[in-house]
Amino acid sequence: MIQIFNPSRLTRQPFFGELIRYLDQHDDVILREIKAQFPDVAVDKLMEEYIKAGLILRENKRYYLNLPMLESLDSLELDQEIFVSEASSVYQALLEQRFETELHNQTNAAILIEQTDFARTKMTLSNYFCKVKHQYPLTEKQQELYDILGDVNSEYALKYMTTFLLKFLKKDQLMQKRRDIFVDSLVVLGYIVQNEDGKYELAVDFDKERLTFYLA
């Protein structure tokens, strides 16, 4: 099966996903067969869009896949749109590939450095912002964070999260008397933990000179 990562407006359409899987399993497909397979879809219009985008090839009234399939990880960049076959040798390597992301903000000099997989399924703040922005499906854990934060402005959230985290410059434990969604979010993300006394402790590495927090 062909998997699409970081789909565009065209490639995230449900019909496109079904179409490429159909063409991947059938040879020398004609338009009539596609219309019969997808009777409730505006096939003519969408097929022209896919052909114009270079994703589908039409030759002698036959339709074929023309996807730029991933064959190597050498030039792979995070958030790049890719097409990859689950049966290919590069697929497993892709799942194991790791990337580093950095989050900065305009309020202070704090930096959040996080590790992620290519699909951004790992529970990090960067992944959350990315998926909400592009309306990608959330993992169960990311949905838990969404239930707290919702579609929050990233700069606004970072302002309050980093301001709280920087308090660990002077103290090892912090009290938060009132319920705070940003503090709750830091707990869900794994940046802080609440001890038996109800105080919060830092749960990640913190370079105090560089004001950098590392979420492994």
Can you describe what each PLM-predicted range is?
Residues Q37-K52, D172-L189:
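Short amphipathic alpha-helical interaction segments
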Residues M69-L103, F206-A216:
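Short, amphipathic alpha-helical interaction segments positioned at domain boundaries
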Residues I2-Q3, A42-D44, L57, F164-K171:
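Extended alpha-helical scaffolds
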Residues I51-R62, V183, V187-G198:
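A short, conserved structural fragment
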Residues R62-P68, G198-D205:
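Minor-groove-contacting beta-hairpin "wing" of winged helix-turn-helix DNA-binding domains
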Residues D28-E81:
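N-terminal interaction modules that seed assembly of large macromolecular complexes
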Residues T11-E33, E86-Q176:
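Short amphipathic alpha-helical interface segments
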Residues M1-R9:
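Short, Lys/Arg-enriched N-terminal segment that forms or immediately precedes the first helix
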